[in-house]
Design a protein with these regions (language model features):
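Alpha-helical linker/hinge and terminal dimerization helices associated
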Residues: 9-10, 31-53, 254, 258, ...
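Hydrophobic hinge/microswitch elements
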Residues: 94-99, 103-107, 112-113, 175-223
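Flexible hinge/capping segments at coil-to-helix
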Residues: 120-131, 135-158, 162
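Short beta-strand->loop
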Residues: 122-132, 214, 219-233
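A short LG(V/I)-centered, amphipathic sequence patch enriched
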Residues: 5-24
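Secondary-structure junction motif
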Residues: 157-178, 247-248, 255, 265-266
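A late-sequence structural motif
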Residues: 71, 204, 224-266
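Central regulatory/effector-binding core of bacterial HTH transcription factors
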Residues: 56-119, 190
């Protein structure tokens, strides 16, 4: 009944009910996206009013699976520990889902690799990261300064899923060298970075990973990393936020907390 009233009020068809199926129309998708944004703003308003009464701030931060595995979680925990008035909730998701949640106000900030051209979204640079070949410390490559693509083709490779930014950056650099992932011996694809690192440590294969996710292992000397010849796979780690985000002082504090956390691994 409510949907029918809404359709009449907006003069659109939200659902196509033909052929015995109920399918969301293009106009319906716009209505749903707008409703999500309104709900996000409403929840944000309720949280802000509650926070102002209790003199605290709630911050929902979305991070990619890569960011979850590097010192960012530690930096957020440090910031929360040092600031009693700030309560942080961290959620993980794919980069596309995080941007969607950011635009519908379901999250306040997103920590992402790279940038997208969107006038509503602002960025603050946190760090510059680069992809490396990660191998077991017992692997013959561990003592090398560099490895070639031809040598890499002879290795068992464990890669992130095709939907990940890490995988896409590697694939793009291969293509610029007239190569393809299909030229390599990929034995396993998975999304969990901790599992990939565990398999590398146990010499099941090698992987292309962001250096930032290997800092703990490098400090413990449980994984070795090295560059791949002709592949300069550099990317930014950015703090993304809506143009109307008001607590800009928190942004710089979070970057400072991240830099402070990084220094512990050096």
């Amino acid at each position: 009944h409510h949907i029918k009233v809404l359709e009449e009020e907006l003069n659109v068809c939200i659902f196509d009910r033909s052929n015995g199926k109920v399918v969301v129309t293009r106009e319906g998708e716009e209505v749903i996206n707008c409703a999500k944004k309104m709900l996000g703003l409403y929840n944000s308003l309720r949280q802000d009013l509650s926070d102002s009464r209790r003199l605290v701030s709630h911050l929902t931060v979305g991070v990619t699976h890569t960011a979850e595995s590097n010192p960012i979680a530690e930096a957020l925990a440090n910031y929360g520990a040092q600031n009693d008035h700030v309560m942080i909730k961290m959620i993980t998701g794919t980069i596309n889902k995080l941007y969607s949640k950011l635009k519908s106000y379901e999250i306040d900030l997103a920590i992402v690799e790279g940038r997208i051209p969107d006038p509503e979204i602002r960025y603050l640079l946190m760090d510059t990261d680069y992809l490396v070949l990660a191998v077991s410390v017992h692997h013959p490559f561990a003592k090398r300064a560099m490895v070639t693509l031809e040598e890499l083709k002879k290795e068992r490779m464990i890669l992130r899923l095709p939907s990940s930014g890490t995988r896409n950056l590697f694939a793009a650099h291969l293509e610029s060298n007239n190569q393809s992932i299909n030229d390599f011996n990929v034995i396993l694809e998975l999304d969990n970075i901790a599992t990939i690192k565990d398999l590398i440590r146990r010499d099941f294969g090698v992987s292309i990973l962001p250096r930032s996710v290997c800092l703990g292992e490098l400090k413990k000397k449980s994984i070795a990393v090295l560059p791949v010849e002709n592949l300069s796979m550099v990317r930014e780690i950015n703090l993304a936020y809506q143009s109307d985000f008001a607590q800009t002082d928190i942004l710089h504090d979070l970057v400072e907390s991240y830099q402070e956390t990084l220094r512990r691994y050096q």
